[in-house]
């Protein structure tokens, strides 16, 4: 029986989840909800179903896999990853997974706050000033490893890819000083399942955010 992934018809928080579902060759279908245009940004497609799905904390994205009904994007990633042993094996690897899972979410949220803010034009230059340091931390954490945790890919590589790619779209030159991050992105995009997905009609690279956002809403 196929899993169902529910989310807005955007990239957003579902990008890493979709990539992981494809990489693991999981059987799934998507339930995509459309938000209305300004000024109302009608969300009735989702709100009409929100409390009817049996979710403990009704929100998007959600994943329904038989009796398992999961919200929170990282919880969904962890659930899929545990099925395929993509959570790290040693204690050291699991520590690195935990650190990067939270760091990637922090940085992703920081960018989203800027992109959704009415003060976007004021906040963007300030964010760009901090960007090299953010990327340097990712670069140092990766080091000479092929994947962020070590020799084997884990689910946090999908989060890291998402956040690095988002920033590459936001500021195309932001990775130029960090060849190991550029190599990581190429390595990730070169994975057979990922490459095939990115060439398919299912792939949804944009819009990055919902229509409420000031930047990345198209």
UniProtKB/Swiss-Prot annotation:
EC number: 2.5.1.18, 4.4.1.20
An annotated GO BP: glutathione metabolic process
Ranges for domain GST C-terminal: 90-208
One Pfam family named in its UniProt record: GST_N
Disulfide bonds: none
Keyword entries, A-Z: Cytoplasm, Lipid metabolism, Lyase, Transferase
Tissue: Expressed in a wide variety of tissues.
PROSITE patterns reported in the protein's UniProt record: GST_CTER, GST_NTER
InterPro entries named in the record: Glutathione-S-Trfase_C-like, Glutathione-S-Trfase_C_sf, Glutathione_S-Trfase, Glutathione_S-Trfase_N, GST_C, GST_mu, GST_superfamily, Thioredoxin-like_sf
GST N-terminal domain mapped to chain residues: 2-88
UniProt: substrate binding residues: 116
GO molecular function: enzyme binding; glutathione binding; glutathione transferase activity; leukotriene-C4 synthase activity; protein homodimerization activity
Record's keyword annotation contains Cell membrane: no
Cell location: Cytoplasm
Gene Ontology CC: cytoplasm; cytosol; intercellular bridge
Keyword RNA-binding applies: no
Residues the entry annotates as binding glutathione: 7-8, 46-50, 59-60, 72-73
Family from the record: Belongs to the GST superfamily. Mu family.
Function field: Conjugation of reduced glutathione to a wide number of exogenous and endogenous hydrophobic electrophiles. Catalyzes the conjugation of leukotriene A4 with reduced glutathione (GSH) to form leukotriene C4. Can also catalyze the transfer of a glutathionyl group from glutathione (GSH) to 13(S),14(S)-epoxy-docosahexaenoic acid to form maresin conjugate in tissue regeneration 1 (MCTR1), a bioactive lipid mediator that possess potent anti-inflammatory and proresolving actions.
Self-association state and partner proteins as the record states: Homodimer.
PANTHER family: GLUTATHIONE S-TRANSFERASE, GLUTATHIONE S-TRANSFERASE MU 4
Protein name from the UniProt record: Glutathione S-transferase Mu 4
């Amino acid at each position: 029986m196929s899993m169902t992934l529910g989310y807005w018809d955007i990239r957003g928080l579902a990008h890493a989840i979709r990539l992981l579902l494809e990489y693991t060759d999981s059987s799934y279908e998507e339930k995509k909800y459309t938000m209305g245009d300004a000024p109302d940004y009608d969300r009735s497609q989702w709100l009409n179903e929100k409390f009817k799905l049996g979710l403990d904390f009704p929100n998007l994205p959600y994943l329904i896999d038989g009796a398992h009904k999961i919200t929170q994007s990282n919880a969904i990633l962890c659930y899929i990853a545990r099925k395929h042993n993509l959570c790290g094996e040693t204690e050291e690897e699991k520590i690195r997974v935990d650190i990067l899972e939270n760091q990637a979410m922090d940085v992703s949220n920081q960018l989203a706050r800027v992109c959704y803010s009415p003060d976007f034009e004021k906040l963007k230059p300030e964010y760009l000033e901090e960007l090299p340091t953010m990327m340097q931390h990712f670069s140092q954490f990766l080091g000479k490893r092929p994947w962020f945790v070590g020799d084997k890919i884990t689910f946090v590589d999908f989060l890291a890819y998402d956040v690095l790619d988002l920033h590459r779209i936001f500021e195309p030159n932001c990775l130029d000083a960090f060849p190991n991050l550029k190599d990581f992105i190429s390595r990730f995009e070169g994975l057979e399942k990922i490459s095939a997905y990115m060439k398919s009609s299912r792939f949804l690279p944009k819009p990055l955010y919902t229509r409420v956002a000031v930047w990345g809403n198209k």
